[in-house]
Amino acid sequence: MDKRTLAIAILILALALSTTYALLNWRTEPECISSPDQSWSSESESQNPGDLGSQTPNQEILPEGNQRQTQPIEEQSKPPTPKNLTVVDSTGENITVNLPVRSIVSLNHGMTEVICALGCEQLLIGRSASCNFPPSVLDKPVMGSSSYSPNVELIVESKPDLLVADTMLSYNKEVYNKLRDAGITVIVEINNSTRIKKFIEYMGIILNRTERAKVLLDFINYYELLVVNRVKGIPDELKPRVYSEWAATAWRSYGPGSAGHLMIVTAGGLNIASETEKAYPTLSPEFVAEKNPDVILIMLPGELKGSIEGFVSTRDEVLARPALTGTRAVETGKVYVYDPIIYQGIRYPVGLLYFAKWFHPELFKDIDPGQVHSELIRQFFGVSLEGIYVYPP
């Protein structure tokens, strides 16, 4: 073998070893335990992470075009020191979490998805009935129907290091106090765009998954900024008037201070309920007809999830309302029914993209929200997206 051939062989061997090492590093993850003692408060930053367009430590300026830059997920290799971490949850409570956290009960589906997306599903020892994704969590014991109605006895008996729930738990003071009196660390959060990024950030610290949390936050921030950058500068006279309705009650809408209102405004729409005094006002049919919305958004009722028939029947009921028959939204067919999961938790940017494309289709011709949804599910859960989430598609 001559020197030139030998040199080429050595180079090929070096490249093979380098590739193998990189793949091993990608696949090898540390134990899901907590990071060293530190104090972290959601009030420590000057801007609320839910303030769309604000820069966070994990946020990057969009690259040219629409290609989102991805990066490998690498975790800390240094063993953490198990002490404690203090966070401020959505109720304003200072919550001290003893570290390491080795067992969690989650009573909210969005928070369960965050924990699993961070690669810590093995820490879940219980869930509420609504926590049904990823499919593998269905093997976890059910410890209540919701955050409002947990099985206190079962949870206390299981002795979790941490319990996460949505604000419905704080409304049930008796149950909330029983759990805390039993010595269980309870974090109450809001599962929407106003708080989800904070939850991801501090759960990344608690679970020693800061790098994975950064990748997840980068995904959310990328698409959030994409929408913000494309709709900024649109004058109000070119923005569609939007009527958005809750699933629970006809004519109940979203006013200032609600996540639904924030979604509409961020996506480049004008909320017809923006001048109401309540966050969740009930509007009169006459008021909606007078505002003559260009787009109507209807949340799919929970009991109708899982089939196209539920979407179709919900839309048909809205189209048949006498007060709406003469509105531009009905006349142009811009009445959309959506599963609320698309704007909750880590799926929030998916809902934002759907809203933006419905409001300004000409600005988002190159964006397929369904494809983004599929990418998110594949990248962070390793499964394929199934089901129906919007109608018409």
What label would you give each PLM region?
Residues S90-G92, P141-E153, T276-P285:
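Short helix-initiation/N-cap motifs at beta->coil->alpha
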Residues G110-E113, S130-F133, Y148, L162-N172, ...:
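Solvent-exposed loop/turn segments at secondary-structure junctions
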Residues D2-T112, E211-S244, F364-P393:
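Bacterial Sec-exported substrate-binding components of ABC uptake systems
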Residues R102-S158, L162-S170, I272:
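A short, structured surface patch at a secondary-structure boundary
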Residues K83-N84, N94-T96, S103, K173-R252, ...:
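Extracytoplasmic substrate-binding proteins
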Residues T96-N98, P135-V142, A213, A267-E277:
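A local structural motif
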